[in-house]
Amino acid sequence: MLGFTYSFSVWRGDVDPVFPYISAAGDNRPEACMFSMFLNICSFLSMLIVYLRYSLVAELNRSSDLLLKSFNRLNLYAGLLGASGMFLVANFQETAVIQVHLFGAFLCFGSGCVYMLGQAWISYRMYPLFSGIRIAKIRGVMAIASVCLFFMAFGFGWAAANTFHSVFPDLPTPRPWTHKLVPMPATICTVSQR
């Protein structure tokens, strides 16, 4: 779905085709309308998938493991919180309200990392009856990589903004960061979460 927005943004020359800054693809009209619509659909589908996974684990567990039952419910909240962050990113474009947009992105990716770690733990906990050790290990590796990349993206973005503002204190942070490798960790983090 979002590939359409990306393709349209590249065709119009609004983003760099190699390393696009994700929010820049949905910042100008008409891309902003398509970006919001498709990301809202993705957010709804993410909520649905999170709830279906919660229901599956709850049904397979059927109160036989109370710790797993409680943790599954907490992980449901983390997943729904991440999808809600995606709604914020979709509906508050970067140039409109940057604080809400960045909060939504942080919520989306941060809660997504927590959700992935939780799913990895649930898979380990459900082994050997309902989950294979291979899928549990794959989920664990992907979750740890996602957390590392999330902190790298956050850290490098913060450092880049501080460095820029130490030299140019009166200028706003330049956006979008196209034709630079700054959004690369965020892109890797996004890909690793799917």
PLM segments and residue spans:
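Membrane-interface helix-boundary motifs at transmembrane edges
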Residues: 58-71, 97, 127-135
